[in-house]
Amino acid sequence: MTSPQTHVIVIGAGITGLLTCQGLKKAGISYSCFERDTSLNSRSNEWTMAIHWSLPLLAEILPTEVRAKLATIACNPVAGIHSGLYPIIHGETGDLITGVPYKDGLRVPRSKMRALCAEGIDVQYGKTLADVAFNESGNGVVATFTDGTLVAGTMIVGADGPRSRVRETAMGDAKLAATTSFPIFHTNMTVCYNDAEKAKFVREKYPTSYLALSERSFHAFQSISSMPDGPDHPETWVFHMAMAWMGQSDNAMCYAERLALVKSKAEGLGEPARSAFMWMPEETEVHKADISYWISQPWNNRDGRLTLVGDAAHPMPPYRGQGLNHCICDVSKLLAGLAGVHSGSTTLSDAIQEFEAEMIPRGKEEVTCSVENGKMLHDWNKIQESPVFKRGFLPMDGHDTRKEIAQAS
């Protein structure tokens, strides 16, 4: 016996929300998707993201015609989806410290990944969630938006990012749902050198990406982001750059002041990091990222009528490349549960209970690990003990990093 009445309200049209909608559409489950931004890629800041252990899950979620385009949005179109060792290098010498193994990895620009996931998905933009009400009968939910729009559904899925409005409803208290600031000065930059020789030089040794760790306890990251005119036109290649160190950021600094600060640190680096950062054009916009986290914990899912996925469920520091992979994993497991509801083989309450019983502990462990890893990677004396050195890019899966460190020492 099927349940064709199922209608899912998805809040947030980031990658996680869009993937949720792709899976629902593929399964024949009705959905509505709402996004507070006014358009798909309305924000100017760009960055790159790594997909590795979750790639098989992503392939299952996407419809065939969208899945076929995955390799075309790779930051490095020459490499596409590939396996190898991710280079972590010594900031001052440029020498390799370690290579972190990965299998079937894909690095993508956020904007292209989001655009791909949006193909064929109906999104209502400019919609900010104001309230969520639950029918006293125990069935159904009503979402109210700031423009007065009311939308009824079977359940609501919060895919609305680290500062999730849906999470506030789930926790019943904005304070309990609030993120904790990770005390780091983290900068992101999108750079085009407009110079073929410079662009080729900074990619010569590490064609896709690298992470440089400095003895002065900061990191410098570079990745190719896109090749607008192809591999044969390096003068138009675009790079994602990042630099970060522990300490509170100064919100009053302008782009030029941040650029000067970043270059002052880059001056003491070895190649290729030194030139990569010192050659950044003076008009480079140096964005400050607000890194925060929330340690996943049980919430009131209202008998399965509310749940969270992705950064709404487990926002984490980005220094082990896990965030997007867990988002994809969440969507995969949620869709499996909702497919059972749609077919009538399980109830909504049971499906969401089972989903959260796996996802919340997984999210809690990964957030805790990512916080620990972020601190260690920005302390030269502790980098070798960090989870990324000990565990690589593998999900934690109940793995106790602290126990492994103790056994190794």
UniProtKB/Swiss-Prot annotation:
**Which EC class is this protein assigned?**
oxidoreductase
Report TM segments. Answer: none
UniProt-annotated binding residues for FAD: E35, A50, R110, D311
Protein name (Swiss-Prot/TrEMBL):
FAD-dependent monooxygenase phnB
Q: Which GO terms describe its molecular function?
A: FAD binding; monooxygenase activity
Q: Which domain of life is it from?
A: Eukaryota
Q: What is catalyzed by this enzyme?
A: 3,6,7,9-tetrahydroxy-3-methyl-2,3-dihydro-1H-naphtho[2,1-b]pyran-1-one + NADPH + O2 + H(+) = 2,3,4,7,9-pentahydroxy-6-methyl-1H-phenalen-1-one + NADP(+) + 2 H2O
Q: What happens when the gene is disrupted?
A: Loses the ability to produce phenalenone, and accumulates prephenalenone as the predominant product.
- What is this protein for, i.e. what is its function? FAD-dependent monooxygenase; part of the gene cluster that mediates the biosynthesis of phenalenones such as herqueinone, compounds that have been reported to treat tumors, bacterial infections and/or mycoses, and rheumatic diseases. The non-reducing polyketide synthase phnA synthesizes the heptaketide backbone and cyclizes it into the angular, hemiketal-containing naphtho-gamma-pyrone prephenalenone. The product template (PT) domain of phnA catalyzes only the C4-C9 aldol condensation, which is unprecedented among known PT domains.
Q: In which pathway does it act?
A: Secondary metabolite biosynthesis
Query: What organism does this protein naturally occur in?
Result: Penicillium herquei
Q: Which UniProt keywords apply?
A: FAD, Flavoprotein, Monooxygenase, Oxidoreductase
